[in-house]
Amino acid sequence: MAVKVVMPKLGMAMKQGEVSIWNKKVGDPVEKGESIASIQSEKIEMEIEAPEKGTLIDIKVKEGEEVPPGTAICYIGDANESVQEEAGAPVAEDNMPQAVQPVKQENKPAASKKDRMKISPVARKIAEKAGLDLKQLKGTGPGGRIVKDDVTKALAEQKKDQAKPVSEQKAQEIPVTGMRKVIAARMQESLANSAQLTITMKADITKLATLQKQLSPTAEERYGTKLTITHFVSRAAVLALQAHPVLNSFYQNERIITHPHVHLGMAVALENGLVVPVIRHAEKLSLIELAQSISENAKKAREGRAGSEELQGSTFSITNLGAFGVEHFTPILNPPETGILGIGASYDTPVYQGEEIVRSTILPLSLTFDHRACDGAPAAAFLKAMKTYLEEPAALIL
């Protein structure tokens, strides 16, 4: 009897999965565990393996088509076998095939250069079909991995070189796929379905900056982690959320759901998009433990090692544009969260202290919140609590 292969559920929040490319065609023999297709959903590209040995006798979902988890995408059976569709209940999650985690390239002693190259299966197949030299491609994915966008851009450049003079060239149309498609949908959904408001505040972190410089070398020596201002701000946010739980909530189905634990989402920028790894039960972590988790999660995200479960489930998020010189901005909520904190670029400025003018380091903070769940006064009180922690930082290390 033919075996049905379905779109796997990569995470609790997954609603649709896209078949990026088929590695096999109808009539091809397959081995158990062999990759038959690549799928992408929720910012992650993965492969689907054949659950049994046999022949690919039918493909139900075309390349580029999106379907819900549990939908049959193909059938594997005997070469002359016909497919008998099963009617009734959807496939249970326990019976769904397991998707392979993002491909990790291993340095095997006898491997060829082709095998050692960091490239996604989709990108490799498109490049080889088009006759592109893989060695000439520059990867922009995590860890320098060559992704689909790199190949499509290289093909576009190749066509451009063979096209009309520069003065006659037209604007380039870039299809919105993969991670960018997910980000676009979620950001539009966030703004359309919530009442977002951003308030700002400045904290004098002169004492904190001095403390950070004193503690960071010791932390690196003992624990292998440098302490940054972001780590202190994150710790302050966790403490402030415990005192102001309305910011650690969801607005869903006309109900406000407050969470007993702080699952902190820390936005990480990638070459081709943005992901938000989650630090669970952040309220149970010390400053150094929180710093280690933030650093490790960011590293895994940039190297493409973060799984789908590590990229969802946050109750409050933090994003930092300070490295780009941005001071205040309006972060967009990560639905269904009620709040997101934006960290700006610190700067030195003269400040009055009594009758004296002193040099102080100022850190701009921007808080976006959902006005359906939280009013302006509680949001301002949360920022005020953060300001207090940052200006008197002893509590952050206790």
UniProtKB/Swiss-Prot annotation:
CDD domains: lipoyl_domain. Transmembrane segments: none annotated. One of its GO terms (molecular function) is dihydrolipoyllysine-residue acetyltransferase activity. Keywords: Acetoin catabolism, Acyltransferase, Lipoyl, Transferase. The modification N6-lipoyllysine is found at residue 43. It catalyses: N(6)-[(R)-dihydrolipoyl]-L-lysyl-[protein] + acetyl-CoA = N(6)-[(R)-S(8)-acetyldihydrolipoyl]-L-lysyl-[protein] + CoA. PANTHER family: DIHYDROLIPOAMIDE ACETYLTRANSFERASE COMPONENT OF PYRUVATE DEHYDROGENASE COMPLEX (PTHR43178), LIPOAMIDE ACYLTRANSFERASE COMPONENT OF BRANCHED-CHAIN ALPHA-KETO ACID DEHYDROGENASE COMPLEX, MITOCHONDRIAL (PTHR43178:SF5). This is Dihydrolipoyllysine-residue acetyltransferase component of acetoin cleaving system. It comes from Bacillus subtilis (strain 168).
